[in-house]
A protein has these predicted regions:
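Active-site SXXK
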Residues: 75, 102, 129-155, 185, ...
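Mid-domain, small-residue-enriched loop/turn segments at the edges of structured enzyme/sensor domains
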Residues: 167-170, 202-238
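Second-shell loop/turn segments in exported
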Residues: 1, 27-35, 59-66, 121-130, ...
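Conserved catalytic neighborhood of penicillin-recognizing serine enzymes
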Residues: 149-206, 222, 249, 261-290
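Short active-site loop at a secondary-structure junction
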Residues: 90-91, 116-137, 151-157, 224
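A penicillin-recognizing enzyme superfamily signal
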Residues: 65, 69-84, 96, 107, ...
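Beta-lactamase-like hydrolase cores
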Residues: 53-57, 68-99, 183-186, 199-200
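Non-catalytic, structured segments within soluble enzyme domains
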Residues: 1-66, 211, 216, 224-225
Length: 333
C-alpha cells in the first residue's frame, strides 16, 4: 500500500511522463508482412481451437502447429511476387500436406489481399469444381482398385452421350482420339475415357473410393462428376498424399500439441487408414509422372531434377462470356 501523502504526490504527475517516444505504426512494413504470410494458416488454427472447445484469446494456451515457416514463406512469395499473374485480381488457394503423416505444413488462402485480416481462405473452400484433378480419385483409381485394370487397359475416346439425355460430352479440342490406353487417357486428360471408365466402375464403388480419401457430399454423385467435383484444395492435397505414401489416407491437421494454463499437454497425431492397395497407389503415381512430359497436360510445369507426379484440372466459365478462357486452373500432386 501507499500513504495518503504518496497518493497525493502521484496524482500530480502527468500521465505523459515516462511514456516511450512514438516509434510509428508497428503494423506497417515487416510486422504487417510477417502477419500476412501466415494469415490463412493462423485463421484455421484459431478455428480448430474453437472447435476443440477452447477460447484461444482467453485460455492462455501454448499451441504448437505443423507449420513449416520456410515453406510458407516460399509459398507466399511465389504467389505474391514471383509468379507472373495477369492481374492482381487473379486469386489462388494452396495447401501443402506431408504425405507421411497428414500434417498441413503450408497454406495460402489468397494473394494481393491488401489489409484484409483472416479473410476468405480459398484453400479450404469447397464451392469450386476440381476439374480433371478428380480423374485419378473417382475414375482410374477405383478401376485399378476394384476391377484390377492394368495401366495399358484399352479405353475408348469416341462420341459419348450422357445416358437419358441428348448432352454430348466434348473435350477441350472437340476431337476424339479413338482407342487408347488408360495411361494415355489420364496423361492427356481426355474426358470421354474418364467418364466411360466411371460408368464401368459404377457410382457406388467410386463413392466408396472417394470416401476412403476423405471426400464426400450429401448429394449422390453422377457420371458428370467423373470430370469434376466440388472440393477444396486441402481435400485434394490430402487425397493425393495417399497416392504418394503407398495408399494410406491421413486426415490433414494443423495442431500438433496444446498446453493449457494448468500445464496439461494434449498431443495430436491422427492414425492413417488404408484407402487403397499399395499396387493401386503405385500405378496411379507412375501414370501421373507422365503428365509433365511428352503429351502430358502439364509439360510447362516440368522441373528438371525434381521427382514429379501430378494432375492438372480446369473449369470453364458457366456462360459463354469467356469462350476461350478458364475460370479455374488446378494442379495436384
Amino acid at each position: 500500500y501507499i500513504s495518503q501523502s504518496q497518493a497525493n504526490a502521484a496524482k500530480q504527475v502527468s500521465i505523459k511522463e515516462g511514456l516511450d517516444p512514438n516509434h510509428g505504426n508497428t503494423s506497417d512494413n515487416s510486422v504487417q508482412v510477417k502477419e500476412k504470410v501466415v494469415d490463412s494458416y493462423v485463421k484455421e488454427v484459431l478455428s480448430q481451437l474453437v472447435a476443440k472447445g477452447y477460447n484461444p484469446y482467453t485460455d492462455g494456451l501454448k499451441v504448437h502447429t505443423n507449420l513449416d515457416l520456410s515453406a510458407q514463406k516460399h509459398l507466399y512469395n511465389a504467389a505474391n511476387n514471383s509468379v507472373a499473374f495477369q492481374s492482381d485480381k487473379m486469386q489462388t488457394g494452396v495447401a501443402v500436406v506431408d504425405p507421411n503423416n497428414g500434417q498441413i505444413v503450408a497454406m495460402l488462402g489468397g494473394r494481393k489481399t491488401g489489409n484484409v485480416v483472416y479473410g476468405l481462405n480459398r484453400a479450404v473452400q469447397t464451392d469450386r469444381s476440381s476439374g480433371s484433378t478428380v480423374k485419378p480419385l473417382m475414375d482410374y483409381g477405383p478401376a485399378i482398385q476394384y476391377l484390377q485394370w492394368p495401366t495399358y487397359k484399352s479405353v475408348e475416346d469416341t462420341k459419348f452421350v450422357y445416358p437419358g439425355t441428348n448432352k454430348v460430352l466434348h473435350d477441350f479440342d472437340n476431337q476424339y482420339k479413338g482407342t487408347m490406353t488408360m495411361r494415355e487417357a489420364l496423361v492427356q486428360s481426355r474426358n470421354v475415357p474418364a467418364i466411360r471408365t466411371l460408368q464401368t466402375v459404377g457410382i457406388s464403388r467410386a463413392t466408396k473410393f472417394l470416401k476412403g480419401l476423405g471426400i464426400s457430399q450429401s448429394k449422390a454423385y453422377t457420371l458428370q462428376n467423373g470430370i469434376g467435383i466440388y472440393v477444396s484444395p486441402l481435400q485434394i492435397a490430402a487425397a493425393y498424399a495417399a497416392f504418394a505414401n503407398g495408399g494410406t489416407y491421413y486426415k490433414p491437421y494443423y495442431i500438433s500439441s496444446i498446453t493449457t494454463q494448468d500445464g496439461k499437454t494434449l498431443t495430436y497425431s491422427p492414425s492413417g487408414k488404408r484407402a487403397m492397395s499399395k499396387a493401386t497407389a503405385y500405378m496411379i503415381t507412375d501414370m501421373l509422372k507422365g503428365v509433365f512430359t511428352g503429351q502430358g497436360s502439364a509439360t510447362k510445369a516440368y522441373l528438371s531434377g525434381v521427382y514429379q507426379a501430378g494432375k492438372t484440372g480446369s473449369t470453364d466459365y458457366p456462360t459463354s462470356s469467356h469462350p476461350d478462357g478458364e475460370m479455374d486452373s488446378w494442379m495436384a500432386g
